[in-house]
């Protein structure tokens, strides 16, 4: 099975050129042609108003992962080139700026698995077959059992890749961290199934239902476990269960969801994909720009919830508090890495990402 990585949308950038009248008439600046939206300033506000720190091992880890994933996922040459250009390693390098090479490569490898695993549920083999989708999830999660036979790439590339990631994670992590990552992987797979179910509903989900569903399937929860592992964090489970710690994790998922929906909206329109909160808001009578502005308000609400959660954190003592600070920073870095990667990769905006980031303007088809 070869991952069906999404072909990038065509570049649609273009600068309007000033039009001059004769002699003394003032210069008139032509309005940009086409349908545009202005991304909300909230994308880069509050905890997102920082420049990301990039792991210096980023390019080395990318080269190693690109080669390994091509073999593990049985990519043909064309798919391998597309995957390399997506450059998921850039996101990993921001999510875990202090990780060693082995751990950073593990993050890249897992990101390779999750993108390849997710696509058939979005628009491929399992999107219209809930029974087959459930079977795939059951067989996939079974590979996390420590007594499961080793899966070869020829037998099943996706299960082989996840099992390899899990075995490497298990070798170097504590039992509590293993428990959390396995739990997060299960939550992700359940979220993917919920998304398949929503696609078969006659009506769109509410905003609350959509955000709950996306929190499970957006993939941020497993990233949090990998970030803990990469940054050397090992927080006791009773501390992780505190409402403020749970809130920080959930807000991270919400930030990633809203960032993704804004950055992928043009691609979604081009490809006819409607799993995006903007379509739900437009069903409520909003224009494209009004929906985007509403997402900006939702981002500001995320930042307020974040700071409220921090204010309600207890004090556990120097050792635990130090790890809690690293955890909070790591969760911020996950959202920060997702945001900067989304405007850096060609997956969503072709070659226009840097210009969209600079101007906050996105041209729609």
UniProtKB/Swiss-Prot annotation:
SUPFAM superfamilies named among the record's database cross-references: Terpenoid synthases
UniProt biased composition (Pro residues): 1-11
Stored Gene3D superfamilies: Farnesyl Diphosphate Synthase
Cofactor: Mg(2+)
UniProt motif (WxxxxxRY motif) ranges: 341-348
The record's free-text note on cofactor binding: Binds 3 Mg(2+) ions per monomer.
UniProt EC number: 4.2.3.-
Amino-acid positions noted as binding (2E,6E)-farnesyl diphosphate in the UniProt annotation, renumbered to this chain: 347-348
Enzyme class (EC, first level): lyase
Pfam families attached to this UniProt entry: Terpene_syn_C_2 (PF19086)
Gene Ontology BP annotations: isoprenoid biosynthetic process
Effect of inactivating the gene: Abolishes the production of koraiol.
Region annotation (Disordered) ranges: 1-20
UniProt short sequence motif D(D/E)XX(D/E) motif, positions renumbered to this chain: 118-122
Entry keyword set: Lyase, Magnesium, Metal-binding
Residue numbers binding Mg(2+) 3: 260, 264
Positions of Mg(2+) 1 binding: 118
Record flagged with keyword Magnesium: yes
Motif NSE motif in this chain: 260-268
Family: Belongs to the terpene synthase family.
Domain notes: The 2 conserved active-site motifs D(D/E)XX(D/E) and NSE are required for coordinating the divalent metal ions that stabilize the PPi moiety of the substrate.
Role summary: Terpene cyclase that catalyzes the cyclization of farnesyl diphosphate (FPP) to the sesquiterpene koraiol.
Assembly: Homodimer.
Protein name: Terpene cyclase 4
UniProt source species: Gibberella fujikuroi (strain CBS 195.34 / IMI 58289 / NRRL A-6831) (Bakanae and foot rot disease fungus)
Gene: Ffsc4
């Amino acid at each position: 099975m070869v991952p069906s990585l999404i072909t990038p949308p065509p570049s649609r950038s273009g600068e309007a050129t000033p039009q001059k009248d004769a002699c003394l008439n003032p210069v008139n600046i032509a309005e940009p042609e086409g349908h545009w939206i202005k991304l909300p300033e909230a994308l880069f506000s509050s905890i997102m108003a920082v420049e990301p720190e990039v792991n210096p091992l980023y390019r080395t880890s990318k080269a190693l992962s690109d080669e390994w994933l091509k073999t593990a996922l049985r990519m043909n040459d064309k798919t391998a080139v597309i995957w390399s250009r997506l450059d998921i390693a850039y996101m990993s390098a921001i999510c875990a700026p202090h990780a060693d090479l082995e751990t950073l490569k593990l993050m890249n490898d897992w990101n390779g698995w999750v993108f390849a695993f997710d696509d058939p549920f979005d628009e491929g083999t399992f999107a219209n077959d809930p029974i087959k989708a459930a079977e795939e999830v059951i067989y996939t999660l079974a590979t996390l059992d420590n007594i499961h036979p080793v899966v070869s790439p020829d037998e099943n590339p996706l299960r082989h890749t996840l099992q390899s990631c899990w075995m490497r994670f298990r070798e170097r992590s504590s039992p509590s961290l293993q428990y959390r990552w396995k739990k997060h992987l299960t939550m992700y797979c359940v979220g993917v199934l919920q998304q398949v179910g929503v696609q078969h509903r006659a009506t769109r989900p509410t905003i609350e239902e959509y955000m709950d569903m996306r929190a499970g399937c957006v993939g941020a929860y497993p990233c949090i476990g990998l970030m803990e592992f990469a940054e050397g964090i090992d927080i006791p489970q009773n501390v992780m269960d505190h409402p403020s710690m749970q809130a920080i994790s959930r807000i991270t998922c919400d930030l990633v969801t809203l960032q993704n929906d804004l950055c992928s909206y043009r691609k979604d329109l081009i490809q006819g994909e409607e799993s995006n909160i903007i379509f739900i808001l437009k069903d409520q009578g909003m224009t494209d720009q009004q929906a985007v502005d509403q997402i900006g308000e939702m981002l500001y609400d995320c930042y307020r919830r974040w700071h409220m959660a921090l204010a309600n954190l207890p004090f556990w003592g120097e050792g635990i508090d130090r790890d809690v600070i690293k955890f909070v920073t790591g969760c911020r870095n996950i959202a920060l890495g997702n945001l900067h990667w989304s405007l850096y990769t060609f997956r969503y905006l072709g070659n226009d990402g840097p210009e969209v980031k600079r101007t906050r303007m996105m041209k729609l088809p």
